[in-house]
UniProtKB/Swiss-Prot annotation:
Pfam families: tRNA-synt_His
Assembly information from the UniProt record: Heteromultimer composed of HisG and HisZ subunits.
Gene this chain is encoded by: hisZ
Source superkingdom: Bacteria
Keywords assigned by UniProt, alphabetized: Amino-acid biosynthesis, Cytoplasm, Histidine biosynthesis
Function: Required for the first step of histidine biosynthesis. May allow the feedback regulation of ATP phosphoribosyltransferase activity by histidine.
Other comments on record: This function is generally fulfilled by the C-terminal part of HisG, which is missing in some bacteria such as this one.
Family annotation (Gene3D superfamilies): Bira Bifunctional Protein, Domain 2 (3.30.930.10)
GO biological process per UniProt: histidyl-tRNA aminoacylation; L-histidine biosynthetic process
Pathway assigned to this chain's UniProt record: Amino-acid biosynthesis; L-histidine biosynthesis; L-histidine from 5-phospho-alpha-D-ribose 1-diphosphate: step 1/9
Any GO molecular function: catalytic activity, acting on a protein
CDD domains documented for this protein: HisRS-like_core
Protein species of origin: Clostridium botulinum (strain Kyoto / Type A2)
Cellular compartments per GO CC: cytoplasm
Name listed for the protein in its UniProt record: ATP phosphoribosyltransferase regulatory subunit
Amino acid sequence: MENWNKYIPEGMKDILFKESNIKLNIEDQLRKIYKYSGFSEIISPTIEFYDVFNSNIQAIPQEKMYKLFDNLGRILVLRPDMTTPIGRITGTKMKDCTYPLKLCYTANIFRVNEKLNGKRGEITQSGIEIIGTNGIKSDVDSIVTAINALLSVGLKNFKIELGEAGFFQALTENMEIKEENLKKLKEIIRNKNYVALKKFLDEISSKYSKEDFELIKNLPKLFGDIKIIEKAKALTKNKKALKSLDDIHNIYKSIENIGLEAYISIDLGMVQNIDYYTGVIFKGYVEEVGDSILSGGRYDNLIQHFGIELPATGFAINVDDIMIALKKQNTMSMDKDKKVLIFYKEEFLRKAYDFMQELKMKKIICELSLLDDDKEILLYSKKKGIDFIIGFMGEEKLFVKDLKSDKIAFLKKDEIENLLML
């Protein structure tokens, strides 16, 4: 049997040093945005019962879930998303809370992906859920928070595309079409394949109205700015479809009033395989990443599976894809705190330790040297990105070497602190 002890499974990744630091900074920045927007963070178990995710509206197919068994033979899964566990927590532990609930999270989720497709099996998601209100104010709050979250990490040139789940449902609810053909139709529209769509509709056009036929035929073309809404309205008299278009229009206008409309576009061809979303849906895109970096929308039917009927909306950001985009845009933010290495003679350990603690309290990254040789200390410091080397060697003033300028000085402790705070 082959020994795999030096490898990791497909889709997994070790994240080291600089990359890890950048990722944690992104996560911290997103948490700040949520916190100062009134959201409370929650943490759910990595392992859940399979039954939590086994419903007819589950957004993640069961074949995409990592499954295992407990000692009683019950099926468990590594959580494939965070929204469903939050629905479980809300339905079972938050019935007496004050609504609307504003919850946030940053956690790893796990999905089985085909080999060699380049997708991760472990993904860091960061997002919010607004639970207990079904007005467009909460939809706007969710979308605006998403925009501010992406801006906060330094992302440039992104777009949030708005759609409406009820729009496509309204156009197709009276169609006599098999489930497999409906899935095929959705896929064609999502891929904006005009030729395949015309061929597909020509084969079944006699089964629904000419008006609906024309609108569905044009769905792949109905994307762009707010003018698309009026264009779509001119193609239908379907009351439910018109209501969906009005909802998108009103949400857009609210975002426009805030001044963030530059980040918004409309895509009426945004459809889903499973009837998970019930209202506005949105996805975030950036040129540097092929897939969406953010997805969200209204899902009013999920939490009722856990014992309480509550409307909800929210979004999830793919932190790993954000890192890819920031790297390509050359806008990754590194930790800018100064780094100090203190070396010392053994009899001055206590003084060196106390000074290190003082610097840490001032948010300066500081460590005591584990090396004694001068050359080794210098080499270590350069490779580690240390800014200053400080030496406790018995003199009244301390040895200080600035590794950026290569200058050496002998300074008192308060002078060193002033230097490091510049």
